Amino acid sequence: MSSVPAPREYFLDSIRAWLMLLGIPFHISLIYSTHSWHVNSATPSWWLTLFNDFIHAFRMQVFFVISGYFSYMLFLRYPLKRWWKVRVERVGIPMLTAIPLLTLPQFILLQYVKEKTENWPTLSAYEKYNTLAWELISHLWFLLVLVILTTVSIGIFTWFPKRQETSKPRPAAISLVRLSLIFFLLGMAYAAIRRIIFIVYPAILSDGMFNFIVMQTLFYVPFFILGALAFIHPDLKARFTTPSRGCTLGAAVAFIAYLLNQRYGSGDAWMYETESVITMVMGLWMVNVVFSLGHRLLNFQSARVTYFVNASLFIYLVHHPLTLFFGAYITPHISSNLIGFLCGLIFVMGIALILYEIHLRIPLLKFLFSGKPPVKQESRAAIG
């Protein structure tokens, strides 16, 4: 394992943070979209629906590429067991903390808002379990997937150095055209798996834990591995940080196809399978778009950016119940969708930042929401 730290990737830190924070306008716009959610405005907005669809079509694919990149970077820095422990603690502890402190109260709130408290006793044991699985994992699903990907990638990451010893990467072999074909085929494979499950045992697709543990992991594992490969091969990383007109145009066409599928597709037909193919290739092309823009605009050190990089996970964790509270109790009193959307951003972001500052002053909460053990004062003094 290397003891020499890799150069700081400021633009990747920034992109990861902004993708996390983008969850706030994503969920607030969901209130005002045509999509059915826990809470919705009286009249939907077409432009907020379009905005919401655009974010949804690529955000998490790019996020998992960055996660794979940093995961492999740390894999080279730590012994295997320590690497796994650190990575799982960093995402597992905040996830387990957020369930009783955030998503459980959120679930109780929604039961009263949607007037479902009287129906709860009538549900079967499985229906209660499945409802809790969906509602308690909620927006924390990506943390669960990261824990699974970290565990699964032990074997993959261990195999990478062995492969490097026996073969040398060829720049021509990892072109964006070839990657596009590979991800198209991966999207087709995922669609085929989903269709087979739909034919053989369709009910399992409505199971919350199966969706998070199996389906979401299967979809995002190629992006996670791609991120690790981008760290291993500088030429591959350079392809993503260099603007590509083909990727930009391809992403635009893919988004139009995504919208058409949303508009005319049917869940009983091939809508979800088609969406998986579209978002697989669009996610790849948006990696180039986002990385190249980020490399040009965000590749610098800034105290303000560092603040939001450090705060992004906490803000993301607390924003969801705040958004639902806003949608349930404040949205009905604002007639304008635009004003409601802007007020929602101010409301959620403002309270989230206040809560973030409060939690920084409580060591136990700071540990629980970050997964990072506190640095002992004695150690700091010794270093100083």
From Swiss-Prot:
GO terms for molecular function: acyltransferase activity, transferring groups other than amino-acyl groups; transferase activity, transferring one-carbon groups. InterPro entries: Acyl_transf_3_dom, Glucan_succinyl_AcylTrfase, Glucans_biosynth_C. It is an enzyme of class 2 (transferase). Its EC number is 2.1.-.-. PANTHER family: BLR4337 PROTEIN, GLUCANS BIOSYNTHESIS PROTEIN C. Belongs to the acyltransferase 3 family. OpgC subfamily. This is Glucans biosynthesis protein C. It comes from Salmonella gallinarum (strain 287/91 / NCTC 13346). The gene is mdoC.
